[in-house]
């Protein structure tokens, strides 16, 4: 099994732990981070290769890739290859890892919006209670 490699270590941003990722999401993200081209932020390991590296089935890897996409950490685009006989075949997915700062900023903006909505709901509920109760 051949893994992507950039030496004996890779950097994983500390902020990744602020997002509440599951162990599976973190494992898949870490492997993609290990494989990525630092300039383009892209990599294209196969689902099978990812699964072997993180010791998960291919279906489980697909599930975590989908969840990482939903969280906005990565994008996964299908690719095509042309065989020697001229046939078009599906290639590996092309993964693009988004800059962690953008992901964190979006995460905090989402949390703030949820908090503001909850605060507004509480305010409206209080107003309704005050109107309904006799003075």
Task: Locate each region found by the language model.
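Electropositive, intrinsically flexible nucleic-acid-contacting patches
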Residues: 1-135
């Amino acid at each position: 099994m051949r893994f992507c490699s950039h030496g004996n270590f890779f950097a994983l941003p500390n902020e990744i732990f602020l997002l509440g990722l599951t162990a599976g999401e973190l494992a898949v993200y870490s492997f993609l981070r290990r494989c990525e081209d630092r300039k383009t932020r892209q990599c294209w390991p196969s689902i099978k290769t990812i699964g072997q590296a993180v010791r998960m089935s291919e279906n489980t890897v697909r599930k975590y890739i989908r969840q990482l996409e939903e969280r906005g950490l990565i994008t996964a685009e299908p690719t095509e290859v042309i065989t020697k006989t001229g046939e078009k075949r599906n290639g590996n997915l092309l993964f693009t890892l988004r800059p962690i700062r953008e992901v964190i900023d979006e995460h905090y903006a989402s949390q703030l919006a949820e908090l503001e909505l909850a605060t507004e709901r509480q305010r409206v509920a209080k107003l309704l209670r005050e109107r309904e109760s006799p003075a």
